[in-house]
Amino acid sequence: MPNNQSFAVVGAGIIGAAVARELTLRFPGSAVTVFEKEAEPAAHQTGHNSGVVHAGLYYEPGGLKARLCRRGVTLLQEFCTNHELPYEECGKIVVALDEVEERRLQDIYARATANGVPGVRLLDQAGIREIEPNAVGRAALHSPHTAIVDYAKVTRALVDEVTAAGGAVRMGTEVLRVTNTASGATVHTRAGGQAFDLVVVCSGLQSDRLAKASDAADEPSIVPFFGQYFVLEAAYRQHVKGLIYPVPDPKYPFLGVHLTKRIDGEMMVGPNAFLSFSREIYRGLGINPKDSLEVAANPGFWKFAARNLPTAVREIQSVVSKGRFLREAQKYVPSLADADATRATRGIRAQAMTRDGALVDDFVIQHQGRVTHIRNAPSPGATSSLAIAEHIVEAAIQEHSLTSAPPAG
């Protein structure tokens, strides 16, 4: 039926594309416009991640990550099935190497159980070998339904749905700011302003900058961290059947160097995690003066750095030495001792940080009038993307009493 409402989404990563699609589903016949500064969708975080569909093991029960990850898995699997996109439940083990890590593993198991993750179980050494014959460890947690996809392909399929529903996708169009008006919001580009009833900003690595330019909250700020990946040489691909992860260090918000099967059959080692001197440079030295100076001027970063110096020293060793990097993986799969690997394109993660140097763990979604800003959506952001879209659109419907079609499913 005809619908005279208009909506805009800023950013064509997987979350932006999912929000745009959700708007076309809930408001059929409305005008939905996606603004993306790059020439193609999925140009940044979406197109540079590991492709893992997380089951929801690690997240604080009751938080947005926990709730939206589980719903997101269901929606993503359905979407891939309906669009004939590859989706493989290869499973994952999280391996403890010592007694301290084994105690942490018990905590992860408790969280996974509380979050309703299906099929998770604890393994002894014999159990590890049943799942991954070449892996070693003191104990492990097995998540059989952890999966892999190609998130860039998923994003393109979402964008195709938006255009098929009559939406407009304006690639190569950078949004400078978004302002609230008496009856809606205006998206400002170099070509001028365009009015909409509702705007959702999903700008990832640029989320803090666009929020501040739009007079939204100053916090959280974004500090970019890069993750380096290596592609294991083909002769060793079969040494690992699925995904092998270390037990994460609770003092550091990243999951550590792990072995990840890709949907194309390649086996990845990585990523590590270290401060990035740019937000969007993926090769070479990766230094952007503006981005680097912004981090240096961020008082929260220095507080974070002071608290995490030992971990940073360990991580920089894996950054500068491929051998050191691969040795981390060999702790879990000793048969990789003679394996070589080639450097792949790095990924850059938008990590939200508070003024006191705390890394923001959960998703952060801020509402300002008729504008919604996604301020933090790290892993499992891609896994949760379709559920995040549902959550945001439903919140807008309730907040602004918008007339919509009922939610799917």
Where are these predicted regions, by residue range?
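Flavin-binding catalytic cores
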Residues: 114, 120, 217-219, 236-237, ...
